[in-house]
């Protein structure tokens, strides 16, 4: 059965399907929208008591519901200076060292950090010998992405690609999954060196958004696009630890890359398959360089 599911993903018109679902999710269809939201809440056992708007009818579209805000204070941010926090609600897929430019995906599968970053060689070089973490956001999860530490945006790259599902089953069977799917790469400068936040698209992910540029995808194409940003002066974009940096309209995955020696140890309990909660301790940082 697993082989059938994977084979279907290769055959499906994934981009067309994702655009269609995106249009439906953006539609403001009144009672139909509310009915779809109620079904989704029941199907995935979503705890709406955490949402700023807990009533399904409060959302004009399914996208509004899916990118719902949480109640203030429901995810307290660990403000300890030497603590990096979880950027999302989800589950750790994999984490560990970047070895010779290779990142572990699943048993028998690795992929290139250079390819992940859109073949930006200078960016990849900055993370040689560093660490990575991959976090999967399930449909039930809160889908806003926050900063794990304070950082100033220096570069953003849009990389076109496939739209395979990014669930654990697909990660085990599709080689180079996260480096072949459509993605947005944001590079931040921090006290602990560069930080890459890679927002990976997936089947029926209607779009990826950032707080500084709005919707990045769609539209899609064959071309890699890069934007560079000033890191000093009035136009610099600096986000504090815990600030929102982006969101997925329907679920996906975040891959983080850290500079060599930025991380001392991952926090207690942070390991493959561990549940993550935005704002809780993710890693212990070394002293700034």
From Swiss-Prot:
Single biological process term from Gene Ontology: phosphatidylethanolamine biosynthetic process
Pathway assigned in UniProt: Phospholipid metabolism; phosphatidylethanolamine biosynthesis; phosphatidylethanolamine from CDP-diacylglycerol: step 2/2
GO cellular component: plasma membrane
Record-marked site positions (Cleavage (non-hydrolytic)): 251-252
GO molecular function, one term: phosphatidylserine decarboxylase activity
InterPro entries: PS_Dcarbxylase, PSD-B, PSD_type1_pro
Top EC class of this enzyme: lyase
EC code: 4.1.1.65
Membrane topology field: Peripheral membrane protein
Cofactor(s) recorded in Swiss-Prot or TrEMBL: pyruvate
Catalytic activity reported: a 1,2-diacyl-sn-glycero-3-phospho-L-serine + H(+) = a 1,2-diacyl-sn-glycero-3-phosphoethanolamine + CO2
Alphabetized UniProt keyword annotations: Cell membrane, Decarboxylase, Lipid biosynthesis, Lipid metabolism, Lyase, Membrane, Phospholipid biosynthesis, Phospholipid metabolism, Pyruvate, Zymogen
Free-text description of this protein's post-translational modifications in UniProt: Is synthesized initially as an inactive proenzyme. Formation of the active enzyme involves a self-maturation process in which the active site pyruvoyl group is generated from an internal serine residue via an autocatalytic post-translational modification. Two non-identical subunits are generated from the proenzyme in this reaction, and the pyruvate is formed at the N-terminus of the alpha chain, which is derived from the carboxyl end of the proenzyme.
Modification sites for Pyruvic acid (Ser): 252
A Pfam family recorded for this sequence: PS_Dcarbxylase
Signal peptide: none
Cofactor, free-text remark: Binds 1 pyruvoyl group covalently per subunit.
Catalytic residue positions: 89 (charge relay system), 146 (charge relay system), 252 (charge relay system), 252 (schiff-base intermediate with substrate)
Subcellular location: Cell membrane
Subunit composition and interactions: Heterodimer of a large membrane-associated beta subunit and a small pyruvoyl-containing alpha subunit.
General function of this protein: Catalyzes the formation of phosphatidylethanolamine (PtdEtn) from phosphatidylserine (PtdSer).
Family (UniProt): Belongs to the phosphatidylserine decarboxylase family. PSD-B subfamily. Prokaryotic type I sub-subfamily.
Protein name: Phosphatidylserine decarboxylase proenzyme
Species of origin: Shewanella sp. (strain W3-18-1)
